[in-house]
Structure formats: C-alpha cells, structure tokens
Amino acid sequence: MTETVSRPHATEGAALYIQDVTLRDGMHAMRHRISPEKVAAIAGALDTAGVDAIEVTHGDGLAGHSLTYGPGSNTDWEWIEAAADVVHRAKLTTLLLPGVGTVRELEHAYKLGVTSVRVATHCTEADVSAQHIGTARELGMDVSGFLMMSHLAEPSHLAAQAKLMESYGAHCVYVTDSGGRLTMGSVRDRVRAYRDVLDAGTQIGIHAHQNLSLSVANTVVAVEEGVTRVDASLAGHGAGAGNCPIEPFIAVADLHGWKHNCDLFGLQDAADDIVRPLQDRPVQVDRETLTLGYAGVYSSFLRHAEAAAKQYGLDTRAILLAVGERGLVGGQEDLIPDIALDLQQNLRR
C-alpha cells in the first residue's frame, strides 16, 4: 500500500485546483458550435474569476471534428488562439484522446500557448496513453490522465489503470464519471483505491456529471477523500445534464472553509450573463438526461440519441437504454442510428 500521509488534503488546508471545462465538455451542449469571440468572452471571465485552468477544444478533444463526433463551427486552433489572447493567469488546457488526436496536434496546441493537457482513454485502456503522456512531459506540460466511464471498472481495476498513467508520467489521474452514473459511495471507493496505489505526490482529480443530480455531492465526497483537482463548469455547461456546476460547488467549498482562488460572484455573473444564453437546449436533469445516468451511458451521446429518435419516431429514452444495455463507449456514436433502426423495426413486428 502506497504511503498517503503526506498527500495534500483540502480538509487540512491544501488549496483546490479548479479546472473549468465550459469550453470543452460544454462544447457538447452546443453541438461544438461557438464563435471565437464567445470563447474569448467566456475564457476572459473565467480568468478574471480566478479559476486555475481553462480547458479549450472540441468536446471530444483535439481533432475531434468529424462526422462521428460532430463537426465544429471553428477549428480547435481558432478557439485556442481566442482563449490564449485573453487568459493571463490561468493555465490554458486541452484534452486529447489517443486515436483521435495525435502527438502532432498536441505539439501545435503547445505552440499556441496550451501548457496543460488531459490525456483521455476508456477506463480499461490506459496503456494507449503512454506516448501522449510522455510527449507532454517532454514538452514540459502539466499532464493528467483521464479515465473515462469510470463506473464501468471496479475500484481496484480502475486504480491499476491509474497507476499505469502515473508510470507514464501523469502528474494527476482523474476519476472521470462520463456517464454521470457514480453515486457518493462509488466515488469514495474509487478515490480510496487510487490513494492505495498512487504515490503521495501524484494528484487525484474528479470529473463529475449531473445526470443523477449528484455532481456537487460526488465532488464534495471526492475532495473529502483527498482529491485536489476539481472539474466544474459555468452553469454546469456540459454533456448530458452537464458537469458539476462551478458556482454552487465554490459556494459549498466556502462553507467548508476549503481554499481556492475563485470569485463566486464573478463565476455567477459569467454563468448567467454569458453561458446560459448560448444554450439551445437546457442543460438540466430531465427525462432524457436522467436516463443517461440511470443507464450509465456516455453523456455526449445525448444529442446523437435525440437526433436518431427524431429521425425514426422513437422515444430518446428507449434508445439510451438500449445503448446502455449494449455497453457502447465513446467513439461508438455511429452505432446509435443502427440501434434506433433496430428498435423501430421491432415496434413494427
């Protein structure tokens, strides 16, 4: 068992590292369509409000623009450049999925001012991250491992994958609840499993989704268990029912006396004045997004399932339940229309 006594802990005075994902995970909520000017407005407001890092890219990471994931209104580079022009204090961050983005894209993002990257894999496929984590370290970047759909791996197995990412050079590894399926006990078990195997100097992060209305609660539990890096977004802007909303989480952090650098009112203003008006579909818990969490479905599948439901005259929930039963993971969005067609044919029999 790895010694954990010296691990920094928010309950003992360690400062939280608040990573905003409005301009990455939030891209799913806008179908990856936002002008560079709006990116700059959001990034500038976040920088002024004191977040530690701002993640910018297509919702599926660098080079995620495709028919499978959804084309963006602009390139990653246009969005990153817009943010880089106005971010003066926070770390400009991006996301990379090996097999979607390449080392070449990572190097170009670094040249544009990105100094931190999260390398994301499915929760059982950490081994594919070695090259990208290694390259990020060679560039001198802050680098985290991002184990998506963490609910699909038992705590000990997930921790073993986290240990692999640590061995490749990750400064931090996240419990990433992409489906918004984890409950408080499930989060607690996974963070404790990480603590058991990771070096005390390796940070632990939490990325929560709101599909079961547990994102703030899950994040609080994670911090209580030793997490210091927290993902959140303005107005919860993100895939499915959204991410952990940054404003209420910071309010709760204040009530607990946890250290952070954020201005609560500044975050509230940015959420209500800039982000909410951009939403063409409310980012909230409703019958469709709740089904994502209930069935343990990748949150970014929401818009794809809604489109298929409209095309084939189906209930989106039926599609999402079928997706969950088949165990689809990120990158298999193109199978959703096939599932919808099967459901339609079954109804006609």
Curated annotation (Swiss-Prot):
Which keywords describe this protein according to UniProt? Aromatic hydrocarbons catabolism, Lyase, Manganese, Metal-binding, Plasmid
A single BP term in Gene Ontology: L-leucine biosynthetic process
* Binding residue positions for Mn(2+): 25, 207, 209
Signal peptide (UniProt feature, chain positions): none
The cross-references to SUPFAM superfamilies, in alphabetical order and at most eight, read: Aldolase, post-HMGL domain-like
* A Pfam family this chain is assigned to: DmpG_comm
Q: Which domain of life is it from?
A: Bacteria
List the Gene Ontology MF annotations in alphabetical order.
2-isopropylmalate synthase activity; 4-hydroxy-2-oxovalerate aldolase activity; manganese ion binding
Q: Which residues bind substrate?
A: 24-25, 178, 207, 298
Q: Where is this site: Transition state stabilizer?
A: 24
Q: Record keywords: Metal-binding included?
A: yes
Query: Residue limits of the Pyruvate carboxyltransferase domain?
Result: 16-268
Catalytic reactions of this protein: (S)-4-hydroxy-2-oxopentanoate = acetaldehyde + pyruvate
Enzyme class name: lyase
Q: What is its EC number?
A: 4.1.3.39
Q: Where is the active site?
A: 28 (proton acceptor)
Q: Which CDD domains does the entry link to?
A: DRE_TIM_HOA
| Nucleotidyltransferase listed as a keyword | no
PANTHER family membership: 2-ISOPROPYLMALATE SYNTHASE 1, CHLOROPLASTIC-RELATED (PTHR10277:SF9), HOMOCITRATE SYNTHASE-RELATED (PTHR10277)
Q: So what family is this one in?
A: Belongs to the 4-hydroxy-2-oxovalerate aldolase family.
Q: What is this protein called?
A: 4-hydroxy-2-oxovalerate aldolase 2
